[in-house]
Each structure stands twice: as C-alpha cells, then as structure tokens.
Regions:
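Eukaryotic scaffold repeat domains enriched in small/polar residues
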Residues: 1-217
Length: 217
C-alpha cells in the first residue's frame, strides 16, 4: 500500500507543470511523521507545506483531516513535525513552528492545546497502563544564544499536559542534547533520541538521579 505521491516535475526533477495544488486527501507535501492506532488506522503529519494531520483507515481509505491551512488559530498548524497516539486513540501533534502540541480525538476533532513546552520538534508516548507524553524543545544552532540554551530540553508530561519533569541541556557531550529531531519512548524510564546537529542517537535512562546516557556514533 502506498499513500501519496510526489509529481515527477517537483524538487528539481524537471519544470513544474502547474503551481502546487491545494491539499488533496491522497497527495502530501513533505510529510514529516506517521503513526498507527490500535485499530490499524493511519495518521500522517503532512508537515512542511500542507500543515495538517490526516486519518486513513487500515486499508488506506481517507477518513478525516484537520483544517489544512497555515495559521495560529486552534486546529490550524505551522509545520506539524511529529505525531503520536495514546491508548485511548487520541492524537498528539507537535505543531512545531507555533510552539505547541495540539491534541485531537480519533476523528481529528480538536480537544486541547498545550502551549507551555517550547518548540516541540518530536513527541512520543510511553506504553503501559499509565502513559506519559514526552516532547523535545528544540531549535536549530543558528538561533540566538538565548534560544540555543533550551535546545536540549525534553519535557515529561501527563497526557493532560501537566509537566511532571524536565531534563536535558543544550550541548554535544554525553547526556547533553542538540536539536532532538525524533524520540522513541521504549518505556517511561528509557527513551531514544536522534539529534540532527550532533549527528548521533542517544539512549537516555531516566531515574531519580537524572538521566544516564549511552550513545551510538
């Protein structure tokens, strides 16, 4: 099964035949992430240009979409960069350039907005009966020093957005973080992060004494 297709004339492969069309249920424009729920439904963060989240059933049939226009109004997005799902089927979208996480039900109806965790580049939810939401607060290296100081933060939250912890600082040493582009939540005490500026992945083991780190280069 394939969802979406880039026209051969785009991205330097030949002259453009026509301007980029408005969002279509089966045509993406630089999608950034994908997740499936327990029923096999597929959710796509159609990220860099279409600014929407889309739902398909397990056979790939279109079901629903968020608004699909760039903006700051509830339900609008500006670069939905990461997407994850909880046990109840709620969808969490890292609305990166708006500095917030938007939460939708399984039908992509907006339920909540969390705008207190910086610029979320990546989100994930731990497995198990009591789930936690993790979100990276990341910014590129060329930003001003005051912003760079928080490129290593990762927030740990209850699913209602309550922050229960925060760890990490900007840097390229072990245990420091540099523009976390992706997170995998293996469990509530162990996460994997991919850092695009430091060119590495780290495994962080969380505990009362703070995160312990191993990395792969």
């Amino acid at each position: 099964m394939i969802l979406g297709r880039r026209h051969e004339s785009l991205e330097g492969l030949g002259p453009a035949i026509a301007p980029t069309p408005p969002p279509h249920p089966y045509a993406f424009n630089r999608p950034s992430d994908v997740v499936t729920d327990a029923q096999g439904n597929i959710f796509v963060a159609d990220g860099y240009n279409n600014n929407r989240a889309i739902k398909y059933d397990k056979a790939g049939r279109f079901v629903a979409s968020t608004i699909g226009t760039r903006g700051r109004e509830p339900g609008q997005m500006h670069l939905p960069h990461s997407i994850t799902v909880d046990n109840a089927g709620n969808i969490y979208v890292a609305d990166r350039n708006n500095g917030r996480i938007q939460v939708f039900n399984s039908d992509l109806v907006l339920r909540a907005i969390y705008d207190h965790v910086g610029a979320p580049w990546a989100v994930c939810i731990s497995p198990g009966p009591h789930q936690y939401l993790y979100s990276s607060n990341s910014n590129p290296d060329q930003n001003v020093a005051a912003v760079n100081a928080v490129t290593g933060e990762i927030f740990k939250m209850e699913l209602d957005g309550t922050v229960v912890g925060k760890f990490g600082k900007s840097g390229k040493r072990l245990g420091e973080l540099s523009t976390v582009h992706d997170i995998d939540c293996r469990n509530e005490s162990e996460i994997l992060v991919g850092e695009i500026v430091a060119w590495r992945a780290q495994k962080l083991t969380l505990g009362a004494a703070g995160p312990r780190t191993s990395n792969t280069k």
